[in-house]
Curated annotation (Swiss-Prot):
This is Fatty acid oxidation complex subunit alpha. Residues 1-190 are annotated as: Enoyl-CoA hydratase. Pfam families: 3HCDH, 3HCDH_N, ECH_1. One of its GO terms (cellular component) is cytoplasm. It comes from Escherichia coli (strain SE11). Heterotetramer of two alpha chains (FadJ) and two beta chains (FadI). SUPFAM superfamilies: 6-phosphogluconate dehydrogenase C-terminal domain-like (SSF48179), ClpP/crotonase (SSF52096), NAD(P)-binding Rossmann-fold domains (SSF51735). The record marks 118, 140 as: Important for catalytic activity.
Amino acid sequence: MEMASVFTLNVRLDNIAIITIDVPGEKMNTLKAEFASQVRAIIKQLRENKELRGVVFVSAKPDNFIAGADINMIGNCKTAQEAEALARQGQQLMAEIHALPIPVIAAIHGACLGGGLELALACHGRVCTDDPKTVLGLPEVQLGLLPGSGGTQRLPRLIGVSTALEMILTGKQLRAKQALKLGLVDDVVPHSILLEVAVELAKKDRPSSRPLPVRERILAGPLGRALLFKMVGKKTEHKTQGNYPATERILEVVETGLAQGTSSGYDAEARAFGELAMTPQSQALRSIFFASTDVKKDPGSDAPPAPLNSVGILGGGLMGGGIAYVTACKAGLPVRIKDINPQGINHALKYSWDQLEGKVRRRHLKASERDKQLALISGTTDYRGFAHRDLIIEAVFENLELKQQMVAEVEQNCAAHTIFASNTSSLPIGDIAAHATRPEQVIGLHFFSPVEKMPLVEIIPHAGTSAQTIATTVKLAKKQGKTPIVVRDKAGFYVNRILAPYINEAIRMLTEGERVEHIDAALVKFGFPVGPIQLLDEVGIDTGTKIIPVLEAAYGERFSAPANVVSSILNDDRKGRKNGRGFYLYGQKGRKSKKQVDPAIYPLIGAQGQGRLSAPQVAERCVMLMLNEAVRCVDEQVIRSVRDGDIGAVFGIGFPPFLGGPFRYIDSLGAGEVVAIMQRLATQYGSRFTPCERLVEMGARGESFWKTTATDLQ
């Protein structure tokens, strides 16, 4: 069967060739190896037509140019040589486009990422739209890879080595105006005249490359380059803790191209691409990418979602303010906040103002757009304006009677179809719905703080929640830009349940004499964004430890915190960053001062701060308990699948993405090895390390999680 055309060539009367990119049946244009023959055939036609004056690449998709290469191609490669051959094919194709004797212009609207930007870089000029959907970047590092079709060589020469390194090492995406300022594009225009401007540019001589700023020219020279790569290398090593091999290879490949010329650079790029594609880190990061894409397509239930036209929020605190912001500014839905105190409403409104004003200051948003988004948020101290809200999110104090009262008030003051979604982090949803007239419309919707930054939400139906309520709540979470996982209504749900033993063990090691900074550094080295003690300080010691007695009551002794430690800390008025003192001491608000461990913490908890454990031993104790609890959650069907378990841990806790999540990590170690480690730890430190039955059985049978299908919740 012949492949449908992805690249279509049309020659206009003014002898400008328009190449339209449109992958049939797909929302996004992605590049595949099998498209190469089509592109080569078009290049041949372009070379043969001596009348042509220029070429323009444009997308037929409404919101993307090319979103990147199809990642499945890499998964299909069995060896580094096969992946390297893919990169060389891409490089060759881009070189052929660049070698055309007439001007070639990329007309960019929407996402222009990865292989899409590499194609645009191979063109002689680039024009993009001023639309917010238009972003340009090379995000391959987020998949444990580097740009493999010439991006590591072309970008530094176009915009300068230090700017290019920042883009390639972080996967940072640029908006149109930023791209113009850096010289990545030649013009930014309204969408309506994009093609017209690109055609006019194609009629001129090839756009001459803009001279680089003096700083960039110095940094490209031998002395500047040596200094730059040394500094960037140090900074990158500190940030990645050596856990992401792609960053090291990016530096090596870019430097090779600058020092030895593009031919050596392209060769190094293709070779590094092939080798990185085979690393366990890249395989894990790609698995997270596929799993999150899969979760985003999951409707949550078989029922169709109800319409969502407006939302109400109860409580104007930190969580209420954050939820209002993502509902209005990401989902674009009108939001009405109810708080018993006008100050609460003002606080919530200021939260959105601060977020949007920050964007205006950074020139990511126009002031008029800020005002338009703010106009979606209103407040009240009673239920006026709540009568026709489709969904109410409750974000009041963690008090069961108060939340039950909120359910009763919403049922009395809102419509018969209104859904009540509680942002509780610890109370059973079934208990919150216990006295509801319409319990089928009560559900949990657990956000993580800070709401605008944390990508995960847990959606928690109780036994009586309807399928439509689940589907509607999932729909809202996606509109808010969140990745939702549906979890069972059991104490701690999923994320807090696997996090609690991890933090408990860190506190226990403190009481045994380990130092605060040693414990935190060990887990950062392992791959977490912050250590467990710092995390507790950031969340708030009072807030973070509130769930421990709930979990201990539900699951027993393995969740108990070291005796009297938490109460001693809280009785000493230590809440963490929010009041300036926890395990660490913080400088005055508004001043940039480094946090420091408070030495007074050790006598307070009856410890010496003179531990003997190595960093791997510290990490092992915390992480093994988290893995064991995650397996219990699959076994008890708290999560619907290991996919959701991995996504929940990576997006909700910051479990190291390069390990792929708890279940991928268990698979990489082998269940038998995890059981052996836990049995050793149980002998040394106590029964809380006893591996759960499911893990022991899988170890004995040599089974893996990702090769077995987790049973869906009924």
